[in-house]
Amino acid sequence: MSYFPWLTILVVLPIFAGSLIFFLPHRGNKIVRWYTISICLLEFLLMTYAFCYHFQLEDPLIQLKEDYKWIDIFDFHWRLGIDGLSLGSILLTGFITTLATLAAWPVTRNSRLFYFLMLAMYSGQIGLFSSRDLLLFFIMWELELIPVYLLLSMWGGKRRLYSATKFILYTAGGSIFFLIGVLGMGLYGYGSNELGLDLERLINQSYPATLEILLYFGFLIAYAVKLPIIPLHTWLPDTHGEAHYSTCMLLAGILLKMGAYGLIRINMELLPHAHYLFSPWLVIIGAIQIIYAASTSLGQRNFKKRIAYSSISHMGFIIIGIGSITNIGLNGAILQILSHGFIGATLFFLAGTASDRMRLVYLEELGGISIPMPKIFTMFSSFSMASLALPGMSGFVAELVVFFGLITSPKFLLMPKMLITFVMAIGMILTPIYLLSMLRQMFYGYKLFNVPNANFVDSGPRELFILICIFLPVIGIGIYPDFVLSLSIDRVEALVSNYYPK
């Protein structure tokens, strides 16, 4: 047992080191860039070391626990700990943030603030995935919003203020329900004179049926905004259409996954009876979302928005996996969280770099750019294939495991299972249609248009490095998913066994 405060260091290091950026000498952006990338790398290496040497995969309990009294007056503790559910998400956060920092190399305007906000976001995300106290979870959830809002409103497209305001209104609106749920849970357990927010205690807490359903619904609204679940998804295409591509990488790669993580960590673990009641609805919503977002994506002219809708469609698989209440389904949802984290982030990075070079985002104005930009074309095609679940890539394995999870679920009858599977299959047919038509309109054809001031430069070594770094895990998970599944499999088994008592 290691008593070294690994997780506290992992949570606090980025934001503290980030605040020192403002004291660096004003000699261009070079120092700031190298400083930020080295902080991200150091954090990622520390994380990998701590998990390799101090985390036992076979143990389904919480590990690397830390508990420090913080605010004595209402018994608020700084409680951290990780298990198989959060391990993959934390590693994904470290990986994507490091590459997003490298992707933000061309940012020169207010670069100190930009990099500080990215590091602040990093701290918030790792704090969220490792917190073991409900109030701390909520604080980290909120801490995330401020950097994202500033990154959107200061570095973005023409309508950036509109999309940033829309984002903050949606997420803050969802957070109100979250806070009510947190207070309701804390006050119910310990009478009205003190709050009990320790997740370990709350797991064994039982609630009256009506209260549990109300709490579940409150949390669900907050996660439905983040995840996003239709009809609370409309902030996402606007945000992705306007944000700088390194911000998009963090949004698609990590921010959306926080909603899925909260759904598993709080709704499934702490409110099992309500989740058992709501799970058929989750599966139905997930299936509708896959088809709805895929068909909406087909009608988008802006290719960034088209990729944003494909993100929403892929989140449907996570919702179905969580709603299936089976070992296989939940493992599939966790696999899809990681798989889409890699694929979604890269597609936005590619879309951003391509639109920066061409200064165009509408598909009908594009065509024939595969000739001047063969590397971007190759990588765009490869990641589109990964997104449409080509066998041998991570998207295929994740969706297949979710399928099996739904089919083997003892909770649903045969007819509903067949119906949902049929709907999912239609969604999987629509995915290649909108992705391949986007590729055709962008890269094929003869319109080597004469755009003034467009510099058709193919991707340089820095961009290729980012793309190859993400391509390797996508292929790796596709060929040998067991490595990722072994992180969460024991924890998931312990969680699902609560639903089907022996």
From Swiss-Prot:
MF-aspect GO terms: NADH dehydrogenase (ubiquinone) activity; ubiquinone binding
InterPro entries the record matches: NADH_Q_OxRdtase_chain4, NADH_Q_OxRdtase_chainM/4, NADH_UbQ_OxRdtase, ND/Mrp_TM
Compartments where found: Plastid, Chloroplast thylakoid membrane
Keywords: Chloroplast, Membrane, NAD, NADP, Plastid, Plastoquinone, Quinone, Thylakoid, Translocase, Transmembrane, Transmembrane helix
GO terms under cellular component: chloroplast thylakoid membrane
Catalytic activity entry: a plastoquinone + NADH + (n+1) H(+)(in) = a plastoquinol + NAD(+) + n H(+)(out); a plastoquinone + NADPH + (n+1) H(+)(in) = a plastoquinol + NADP(+) + n H(+)(out)
Keyword NADP: yes
Entry membrane topology: Multi-pass membrane protein
A single GO BP: electron transport coupled proton transport
Entry annotated with the keyword Cell cycle: no
HAMAP family listed in its UniProt record: NDH1_NuoM (MF_00491)
Annotated family: Belongs to the complex I subunit 4 family.
Matches recorded under PANTHER family: NAD(P)H-QUINONE OXIDOREDUCTASE CHAIN 4, CHLOROPLASTIC, NADH-UBIQUINONE OXIDOREDUCTASE CHAIN 4
Name of the protein this chain belongs to: NAD(P)H-quinone oxidoreductase chain 4, chloroplastic
Taxonomic lineage from the root: Eukaryota, Viridiplantae, Streptophyta, Embryophyta, Tracheophyta
Name of the coding gene: ndhD
